[in-house]
């Protein structure tokens, strides 16, 4: 049984990936996340698992949209590395990172000027932006928007004729079968009476 399901978008990942994989492999996290959410709700399993998403999440808007599609946890890597000084040279696996972010070379590591305070500031402002979006929507807690695709409104102004042909119905479909749309209960593993659990530690 899974406690956590991670949906990773193609936009994220390591700079050590081959260029062909970065350009041509994978899909956006929205597609996988919405399909996972819909399938779990249809089968009455959504309440038992947490959904996590990552893949170039950078702003509060990204977080709020992913939450509306069903995510409860959010992964950040590229944005955090950039805050610490990463210049996206794609040398992570060669031990030659010119700014000392991804290297064990002592000379290159001396070029690293990132500080923990930069990350604290970044995530503080990110959380503040999320809070502002929640206030604008009119909800008090993040839990109130998880899986609520009905809150996503498509902006139709300034659309080109081709853009107006794109439909988001399958991504924004909401399953209303009375099942939970976010994590509500812990998994039941049926191991309450095994000796390892009963023995004092």
Which role does the model predict for each range below?
Residues 74, 82-149, 153-154:
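Active-site or pore-adjacent capping/gating segments
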Residues 30, 61, 65, 76, ...:
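Short alpha-helical interface elements
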Residues 1-110:
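Glycine-rich phosphate/ribose-binding loops and adjacent secondary-structure elements
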Residues 201:
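Conserved small-residue-rich
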Residues 8, 139-198:
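Terminal amphipathic helices with adjacent charged low-complexity linkers/tails
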């Amino acid at each position: 049984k899974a406690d956590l399901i991670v949906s990773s978008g193609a936009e994220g990942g390591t700079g050590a990936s081959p260029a062909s994989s970065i350009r041509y492999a994978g899909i956006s996290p929205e597609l996988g996340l919405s399909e996972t959410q819909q399938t779990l709700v249809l089968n009455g399993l959504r309440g038992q698992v947490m959904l996590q998403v990552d893949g170039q999440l950078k702003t509060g808007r990204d977080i709020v949209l992913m939450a509306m599609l069903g995510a409860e946890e959010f992964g950040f890597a590229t944005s955090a590395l950039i805050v610490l000084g990463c210049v996206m040279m794609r040398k992570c696996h060669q031990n030659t990172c010119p700014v000392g972010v991804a290297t064990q070379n002592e000379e290159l590591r001396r070029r690293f000027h990132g500080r923990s305070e930069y990350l604290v500031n970044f995530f503080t402002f990110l959380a503040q932006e999320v809070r502002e979006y929640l206030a604008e929507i009119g909800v008090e807690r993040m839990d109130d928007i998880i899986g609520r695709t009905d809150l996503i409104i498509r902006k139709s102004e300034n659309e080109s004729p081709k853009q107006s042909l794109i439909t988001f119905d399958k991504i924004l479909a909401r399953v209303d079968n009375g099942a939970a749309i976010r994590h509500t209960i812990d998994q039941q593993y049926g191991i309450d009476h095994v000796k390892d659990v009963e023995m004092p530690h």
